[in-house]
Amino acid sequence: MDIINRYNRNEFFSADSIHFDTSLKYTTPGGRTVYGGGGIMPDIFIPMDTTGYTAYYNKVWNTNVLYRFTLDFTDRHREEVDAIKSLEQLDEFFAKHDLIKEFTAYAERNGVATNRHQLAVSRNTILAQLRAYIGRNTPMGDAGFYYNIYAVDEVLKRAVVEIKSRKK
């Protein structure tokens, strides 16, 4: 229930909504302020981005239709998928397929009617996830996943920026 309460208090969307018990305040030997009581406040707060979330997206996600499609798609194209050894080959493979068209047909066959307006709003999120989960099923594994999910994952994008800035 804590996660639902945090969501309802907007803690996923604004750092200003997160309140700490100051009686549990502690300063580390390195001079950082931390608070007891459980949980960790990250040094960098990235608000949750729900702009691509619609009722249609929630339905295909919560019924596992999106993930099941990627497994079915991978199985139907197993020989091609197993031959993918680079990100360039993965992009070439995806260029040959209209994933959104195939996915919406699959979703409809599995009881999720397509809402064209909501699909337009959620399209980039859905497409990135389709590509990511299919990419994970290639011999590249997680590299195929993260290469594709990066397009819509603001936390991952910021992490890359922070890591690169610390290497300088």
Task: Indicate where each model-derived feature is located.
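Conserved functional hotspot residues or short segments at active or partner-binding sites
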Residues: 1-168
